Amino acid sequence: MIIRSPESEVKIMVDRDPIKTSFEEWARPGHFSRTIAKGPNTTTWIWNLHADAHDFDSHTSDLEEISRKVFSAHFGQLSIIFLWLSGMYFHGARFSNYEAWLSDPTHIAPSAQVVWPIVGQEILNGDVGGGFRGIQITSGFFQIWRASGITSELQLYCTAIGALVFAALMLFAGWFHYHKAAPKLAWFQDVESMLNHHLAGLLGLGSLSWAGHQVHVSLPINQFLDAGVDPKEIPLPHEFILNRDLLAQLYPSFAEGSTPFFTLNWSKYAEFLTFRGGLDPVTGGLWLTDIAHHHLAIAIIFLIAGHMYRTNWGIGHGLKEILEAHKGPFTGEGHKGLYEILTTSWHAQLALNLAMLGSLTIVVAHHMYSMPPYPYLAIDYGTQLSLFTHHMWIGGFLIVGAAAHAAIFMVRDYDPTTRYNDLLDRVLRHRDAIISHLNWACIFLGFHSFGLYIHNDTMSALGRPQDMFSDTAIQLQPIFAQWIQNTHALAPGATAPGATTSTSLTWGGGDLVAVGGKVALLPIPLGTADFLVHHIHAFTIHVTVLILLKGVLFARSSRLIPDKANLGFRFPCDGPGRGGTCQVSAWDHVFLGLFWMYNAISVVIFHFSWKMQSDVWGSISNQGVVTHITGGNFAQSSITINGWLRDFLWAQASQVIQSYGSSLSAYGLFFLGAHFVWAFSLMFLFSGRGYWQELIESIVWAHNKLKVAPATQPRALSIVQGRAVGVTHYLLGGIATTWAFFLARIIAVG
């Protein structure tokens, strides 16, 4: 830590009125580009307009102006998010059965959408219990609302209006910080100040205020709800906040106020800041008192972290020094120069953030079912499946986005002349070794993981079950995973002496938790079937990484095209007379990476869906006998490819295929329509540009013949545009098909 004398004055960090507000540009499509602003000669114009409208790098090379545009656009994004949230809360207030669900969450399903009776589509309003007819929703909003202490639809209404106000505020902020008071480049590059504010403000005070809300509002209200008190009888949130006696009736230590805090007698607060572990047997969710404790602890950590970096007071860490000191005996110059990269290339910064946020999103997916945070979430199987699937897809897209922006950084922002022997340079110099080893790992994983399945299919086909890899023949037990499970199951009393239960029931050892005759969670057994599919996961993830990493490491140059950096981020081929150089741009690697990301995530969500239906989800009788949805068939059926096709895809598609004439029929239509969208993508992916240009020219001839030819000359999509349209429909069709398949199935049987 370096202590310096404080600077004399605080610098002015904004420019006043830098850009006049005017709507004239709005009437000039493509005003950001000299070429596009001329207007359309051919139909390619509209595609270029869409491709470049948000590519601020292509509008100007002034980093300050680019930064301001991005900053302003972020406020627009936040405005849309608030608008969306407002819509969710408004539907909860206006069209939902939230109050009915609150009074009986085990027998009533959440619904917040009622279809109007036009052309007979009111058939979609299924009976969700309690006499309410509507579409069952699986977003988890009801469970979050209950956990945060919302007891009436009026409160949802008020929150919806509040979110609209914030949406308007964000729109105003976006305009204000671009047109009225635009930050200077130095403000965007002041990373210490940014870290302090984000850590202490967003994460620290954000967590602290949430912890405060939970203690003063959520906990008491949920206490009453769990005890079966009618929501209308429960005091309103502000009464708990203003009247300490109300809280003291539930938590006696509240009567002492903040005295225990300042006298360090913190154990007095153990009534509402607990460390129990496991699930609340009433709601099947994490103990809300554990969650409040967690957010308080997180808040303190981040409030401390938000005071670590040196700003106006000359005390604390400087990021540049930290990075430049970061070198080992084998890493050359180490992280020298990384500070300059991350403060001048927003693509590099974004790539890191996307990689971390994507990984974090996938971690969230896995914790939502293993440690269900909200009341009654664990027994709402449709919501559990939806939340897992949603967070897996989002995480996958963010990670591909990380590779995309890393490659854009390499092409547009990386300056090889100023970098020598730092870590990035060293990685680039031995990229051949990295990629060829990774390629070998992919080949090994692919042949061996798939080979185990093929062996099982062959033995099964030949009637030799004793020679298959299975829990009842040749066992391949995941011993390391089982060891980790066991370690966690034994942790309470050993490595975590204060906890009464392990972090998650899935680890094993503990009993199951059932709510309203449905299993919330129980120890998840792992066996040969999981061992096999986990190696498919390893394979698909490694191939995705191979494609994306190759795209980044070879974005500027390769043996095939040494001057690739001059061709840009996306280009079809290295010009005429250079055969075999198509589809090598960094963009094409992102394109291919998306398909493998889709493969990887599909296998994960299929595994999750079947495993949970087979080994976790189900009903429990009065005698304590658990009946799983698919009766534990995962261990024996999923060890062959045939089993996946027959007992998962085909057997579980029966609900969506047979949904016509029922309230689930919309899923049947979506299943069909999304298959169609997916098939439509193949038309773009499997044919060449010349084919379409030829077709278009004969169609134009016909139009000329009839004297109805348009002024704008029709053109086939460029190669890159065609692939972009193709991959978009492939992913959209595939994801929507999976969504319809999953939801029709789980709403019918769950």
UniProtKB/Swiss-Prot annotation:
[4Fe-4S] cluster binds at C573, C582. Keywords: 4Fe-4S, Chlorophyll, Chloroplast, Chromophore, Electron transport, Iron, Iron-sulfur, Magnesium, Membrane, Metal-binding, Oxidoreductase, Photosynthesis, Photosystem I, Plastid, Thylakoid, Transmembrane, Transmembrane helix, Transport. Phylloquinone binds at W692. It is found in: Plastid, Chloroplast thylakoid membrane. Pfam families: PsaA_PsaB. GO terms for biological process: photosynthesis. GO terms for cellular component: chloroplast thylakoid membrane; photosystem I. It comes from the Eukaryota. Its EC number is 1.97.1.12. It is a multi-pass membrane protein. Chlorophyll a' binds at H675. The PsaA/B heterodimer binds the P700 chlorophyll special pair and subsequent electron acceptors. PSI consists of a core antenna complex that captures photons, and an electron transfer chain that converts photonic excitation into a charge separation. The eukaryotic PSI reaction center is composed of at least 11 subunits. This is Photosystem I P700 chlorophyll a apoprotein A1. It comes from Amborella trichopoda.
